[in-house]
């Protein structure tokens, strides 16, 4: 009876073992974004934690205004205008804007400061402010849009083309999640940009065309519940919303939790009515929150490699003191890893510049690259450098140089020609010598047989 109990307990333990291992292995959860395209990036290092169709062209809607604002802040840095400059709206700046588009209800002849216009642009996405500031900076909206495209190219945006400064739909107005990240990253370098983008509200004082102040409330539900409840994300900081029927619902946001800072891009999300038939869910916000939680909860920063650690021995030629040099990482490497991946689980892939290096080698010489990956996902890349000096042997170097000299095609051809000439010369000399000896023998024989004329008596 006792034995049966022991056997039963043992079998039960064996059955439970897979459950324990499953708990450990499944600590990391995969993520699937419910939108056309998206991106989650660690802001400080640029590490990509998640991407979906990141290089696929999409319509950006009012996310365009991040580039518009960037050019304004760069013009301020260049001294071409200031936040306190007064700008008057023109008829041309207001022409062609959609009547149902986002607006701060600015009218022709109305004067505001650059700072007030930027708040209208980034907090309530007012379309007219983009044209007003574009005209003020570049002389015309068309010239400003041309500058937007030039700046996109300068930032490395390979799949972006702007047709206007507002983001209103145009089939030739497109970008990608990755390109928008590049633009946003640059704009975030301006503290005032982030200050405005993270503002829940703003009051525009009375102007020359209004008697009362205007209250602006952010269109970003992650930082303000004034327009809709249930979306506020406590770690969110900005940045910009956008939507058109063609673009869907779009959002670029950042979030800070502790010492960690992330940037997200969501393009082409939907607005849906839930099963209760009443609640409307705007997925650009809910998916952004879900993606932030996934990134913060399932990635851990770990030290994976020290620059002092040897990585590989690289063969060295032309040295009499050693036949290898030690390669090491150019820098200490730490990276965000899924919470079920330990540093020792990373696969190391070494790509050498040359399979064998010739001495002399100096410490710090580039030998190749090291890639750290797991399940086909690359988590870090770095250069491999020589750890120490390796001197060259003059004898081995000279022998190599001589060998290389005679290995050259032209030298080979000349060598064959010279050899043939030598052979021809030897043959000629030999034949000439033989002929000479043969002729000498004939003359000698003829001379020895001559008796002269017989005398007659």
List where the protein language model places each region.
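Membrane-entry signal-anchor segments at the cytosolic-membrane interface
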Residues: 2-6, 409-411
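Structural signal for terminal/edge beta-strands and the immediately following C-terminal loop/tail
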Residues: 410, 422, 451-455
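Cytoplasmic C-terminal tails of single-pass
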Residues: 435-457
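Active-site-adjacent loops and short helices of periplasmic peptidoglycan-processing enzymes
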Residues: 21-178, 182-191, 196
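A broadly tuned, weak detector of single residues within folded domains
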Residues: 8, 39, 61, 114, ...
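Sec-dependent N-terminal signal peptides of Gram-positive bacterial secreted proteins and lipoproteins
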Residues: 4-26, 416-430
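Domain-terminus/edge residues, biased toward the C-terminal soluble/receptor-binding domains
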Residues: 157-161, 171-174, 178-417, 425-437
